[in-house]
UniProtKB/Swiss-Prot annotation:
<dbReference type="InterPro" id="IPR036236">
    <property type="entry name" value="Znf_C2H2_sf"/>
</dbReference>
<keyword id="KW-0805">Transcription regulation</keyword>
<dbReference type="GO" id="GO:0008270">
    <property type="term" value="F:zinc ion binding"/>
</dbReference>
<keyword id="KW-0677">Repeat</keyword>
<dbReference type="GO" id="GO:0001228">
    <property type="term" value="F:DNA-binding transcription activator activity, RNA polymerase II-specific"/>
</dbReference>
<keyword id="KW-0479">Metal-binding</keyword>
<dbReference type="Pfam" id="PF13909">
    <property type="entry name" value="zf-H2C2_5"/>
</dbReference>
<feature type="zinc finger region" description="C2H2-type 12">
    <location>
        <begin position="742"/>
        <end position="765"/>
    </location>
</feature>
<feature type="zinc finger region" description="C2H2-type 1">
    <location>
        <begin position="420"/>
        <end position="442"/>
    </location>
</feature>
<feature type="zinc finger region" description="C2H2-type 11">
    <location>
        <begin position="714"/>
        <end position="736"/>
    </location>
</feature>
<feature type="zinc finger region" description="C2H2-type 13">
    <location>
        <begin position="771"/>
        <end position="794"/>
    </location>
</feature>
<feature type="zinc finger region" description="C2H2-type 8">
    <location>
        <begin position="628"/>
        <end position="651"/>
    </location>
</feature>
<keyword id="KW-0862">Zinc</keyword>
<keyword id="KW-0804">Transcription</keyword>
<keyword id="KW-0863">Zinc-finger</keyword>
<feature type="zinc finger region" description="C2H2-type 4">
    <location>
        <begin position="514"/>
        <end position="537"/>
    </location>
</feature>
<dbReference type="InterPro" id="IPR013087">
    <property type="entry name" value="Znf_C2H2_type"/>
</dbReference>
Length: 800
């Protein structure tokens, strides 16, 4: 390899093609420098024809070097000859509206050979031939030195310019040539601008890879190029720079992340070199490979489920890219392995790195979305490029029968986007696959069983499994279930089942919930419950305990409660050393522990004593406190209200306070007042035969039937029921023959409907229906109801 024609500019976003054989660092003399802004590969210029071959240089002076820096390639190409200034004939100019660059240097390419992947021009005749993707115009400008400049605009698709015997530039479909101040720029544009924007909007799947150092391109005569980790170059360059390994990690990032597409440097002490590549720097010390993280996002929600050619990407995939050169021995071994890999795989698919990991072998129709040409990169596992997940053919699985809930949100571009929300934590995902993968973070919900056995801790999702399990319990006799749980009383046949059951009680105790006694609020922390009580229930319970937050209505209740926290026990048993904070607990203690020893009991408070003297002394306490003596008996009360209640309830047999509506009597006016309030809003029904009133009409009908039917001379021989008239008895006898007939006791009305009969008695034989029909005596509440009745049932009689 000729080092004189080698120029590597690792941080410049352009490419230069040198046509001289001199050192590339001197850009003067007879030379033409072609600046390529994006990915364009130009090889040696040989003869009058422009031919394309697969990056195999016929001239050893031609070298192609690619530097992958934000998808920009730098190349320096030597050309053998250049024409004299007098032979330079014309310049093709494309304004900035096409590719934002100009060409002003007059260039004449006479004898050059350009490979297939290079977009170049050929000077052939006096006519200008432009392909359909190049926009040209007929505008002609003649310079001072006699050269003709062809100005190309956006508006004209194709034009022919006839001048002196000049040459013409044939521009490829993939290249637009522009005019600039010092150098001819060949700019590659794989997609038209309009189509580029459309494609960018249709699909946003991308994988961004950024390297800080130059890579190496291997030339293959039949295929594209591969970026390989091993090389046949000497281990160190002339300037003393030694090779370096960059390990690039590819992660599937969350689409909600803000830093998608970036790279993150990892400290050199953290990563592990899985492939055992040890590199020496200039001081012969081992250098740990640097690592970079590259994030990927897949935004097409339909891609994962529908596209079967899409390769599944592992969660953590990385590839090693060697920058510089490697040891010759290691490079030779790697080259042999690479050739073996190429023999095994007869057809290699090369595609831009931006799509290689994300689309697997689906390379048809894939173009760069952001308008830049990416380096063709083949990721080869055997060549040491990393642990990329193997593309194994997947079996076609049955579609998931579960229904996933979807939601529609507004995406970053302002268009509606269908997402799959997680029903547990609320996160949203752009495909069902991402949601399924995310659901693994909620194992407690995935493993939750629907059916639980009531006799043991067995759980299952299948009803038939639970049924079979319950059948096994039936086979086990009750005698075998001798082990009982101390906490809940369940029985188990063996100690192992009991131990598993007790673990449930421990888990419940660890997750104990503190519930508010005044509402349904509950929490696992006592402090949160205290704050809830202070914030919500402090108005109803103004006296709050400062220790636990419990509220009370009266200070005495709070004082009694505070004894729990202070440990104060003022009440002591007189028969033993038992002490209590509450007097009621002391009474309970005495009744349960000392009742047999003390047979004498107080009639008032039911306290027991060991002898009669203690009972008499205790009775004096009750007599001193009760100063209100009843005049009718020996009863004493502590206050006058208790004495009044005693007199009314014991010594008053009559009820002086009577209700005006129903004549019910009460001892006290307060009781009568409550009773009268019950009558409000209710209409009273008056019996027509007596002064009986009742709010319930059905009760009134029962009153009439039971009270006002005593004179019944005609009785039935079968049921001994009496009737006032003989025709009523005849109607009654029909009931014994079959269907029951209800006969009104006040009129000749009879019916077989019990509810109709009750309505008849209420509406006809009560005073609550003042408006009565003149023909049938049926009563109505309003005159309009009576008129409607007459028009419906007595129409012929009512008409004059």
């Amino acid at each position: 390899m000729d080092e004189d024609g080698l120029e590597l500019q690792p941080q410049e976003p352009n490419s230069f093609f040198d046509t001289t054989g001199a050192d590339a660092t001197h850009m003067d003399g007879d030379q033409i420098v072609v600046e390529v802004q994006e990915t364009v590969f130009v090889s040696d210029v040989v003869d009058s024809d422009i031919t394309v071959h697969n990056f195999v240089p016929d001239d050893p002076d031609s070298v192609v070097i690619q530097d992958v820096i934000e998808d920009v390639v730098i190349e320096d190409v030597q050309c053998p000859d250049i024409m004299e200034e007098a032979d330079v004939s014309e310049t093709v100019i494309i304004p900035e509206q096409v590719l934002d660059s100009d060409v002003t240097e007059e260039v004449s390419l006479a004898h050059c050979t350009v490979p297939d992947d290079v977009l170049a021009s050929d000077i052939t005749s006096a006519s200008m031939s432009m392909p359909e993707h190049v926009l040209t115009s007929e505008s002609i400008h003649v310079s001072d030195i006699g050269h003709v400049e062809h100005v190309v605009h956006d508006s004209v698709v194709e034009a022919e310019i006839v001048t002196d015997p000049l040459t013409a530039d044939v521009v490829s479909e993939e290249v637009l040539v522009a005019d600039c101040a010092s150098e001819a720029v060949i700019d590659a544009n794989g997609i038209p601008v309009d189509q580029q924007e459309d494609d960018k909007g249709n699909c946003e799947d991308y994988l961004m890879i950024s390297l800080d150092d130059a890579g190496k391109i291997e030339h293959d005569g039949s295929s594209g190029m591969t970026m390989d980790a091993e090389s046949e170059i000497d281990p160190c360059k002339v300037d003393g720079t030694c090779p370096e390994v960059i390990k690039v990690y590819i992660f599937k990032a969350d689409p909600g992340e803000d830093d998608l597409g970036g790279t993150v440097d990892i400290v050199e002490s953290e990563p592990e070199n899985d492939h055992g590549v040890e590199l020496l720097d200039q001081n012969n010390s081992i250098r740990v490979p640097r690592e970079k993280m590259v994030y990927m996002t897949v935004n097409d929600s339909q891609q994962e489920d529908e596209d079967l050619n899409v390769a599944e990407i592992a969660d953590e995939v990385y590839m090693e890219v060697i920058v510089g050169e490697e040891d010759a021995a290691a490079a030779a071994a790697a080259a042999a392995a690479h050739e073996q890999q190429m023999d095994d795989n007869e057809i290699k698919t090369f595609m831009p790195i931006a799509w290689a990991a994300a689309y697997g072998n689906n390379s048809d129709g894939i173009e760069n979305r952001n308008g830049t040409a990416s380096a063709l990169l083949h990721i080869d596992e055997s060549a040491g490029l990393g642990r990329l997940a193997k593309q194994k053919p997947k079996k076609r699985r049955r579609p998931d029968s579960r229904q996933y809930q979807t939601a529609i949100i507004i995406g970053p571009d302002g268009h509606p986007l269908t997402v799959y929300p997680c029903m547990i934590c609320g996160k949203k995902f752009k495909s069902r696959g991402f949601l399924k993968r995310h659901m693994k973070n909620h194992p407690e919900h995935l493993t939750k069983k629907k059916y639980r056995c009531t006799d043991c801790d067995y759980t299952t999702n299948k009803k038939i499994s639970l049924h079979n399990h319950l059948e096994s319990h039936k086979l086990t006799s009750k005698a075998e279930k001798a082990i009982e749980c101390d906490e809940c009383g369940k029985h188990f046949s063996h100690a192992g089942a009991l131990f598993t059951h007790k673990m449930v009680h421990k888990e419940k105790g660890a997750n104990k919930m503190h519930k508010c006694k005044f509402c349904e609020y509950e929490t696992a922390e006592q402090g949160l419950l205290n704050r809830h009580l202070l914030a919500v229930h402090s108005k109803n319970f103004p006296h709050i305990c400062v220790e636990c937050g419990k509220g009370f209505r009266h200070p005495s209740e709070l004082k009694k409660h505070m004894r729990i926290h202070t440990g104060e026990k003022p009440y002591q048993c007189q028969y033993c050393e038992y002490r209590s904070a509450d007097s009621s607990n002391l009474k309970t203690h005495v009744k349960t522990k000392h009742s047999k020893e003390m047979p004498f009991k107080c009639d008032i408070c039911l306290l027991t004593f060991s002898d009669t003297k203690e009972v008499q002394q205790h009775a004096l306490i009750h007599q001193e406190s009760k100063t209100h003596q009843c005049l009718h008996c020996d009863h004493k009360s502590s206050n006058s209200s208790d004495l009044k209640r005693h007199i009314i309830s014991v010594h008053t047999k009559d009820y002086p306070h009577k209700c005006d509506m129903c004549d019910k009597g009460f001892h006290r006016p307060s009781e009568l007042k409550k009773h009268v309030a019950a009558h409000k809003g209710k209409k009273m029904h008056q019996c027509r035969h007596c002064d009986f009133k009742i709010a319930d009409p059905f009760v009134l009908s029962r009153h009439i039937l039971s009270v006002h039917t005593k004179d019944l001379p005609f009785r039935c021989k079968r049921c001994r029921k009496g009737f006032r008239q003989q025709n009523e008895l005849k109607k009654h006898m029909k009931t014994h023959s079959g269907r029951k007939v209800y006969q009104c006791e006040y009129c000749e009305y009879s019916t077989t409907d019990a509810s109709g009969f009750k309505r008849h008695v209420i509406s006809i034989h009560t005073k609550d229906y003042p408006h009565r029909c003149e023909y049938c005596k049926k009563g109505f509440r309003r005159p309009s109801e009576k008129n409607q009745h007459i028009m419906r049932h007595h129409k012929e009689v009512g008409l004059p």
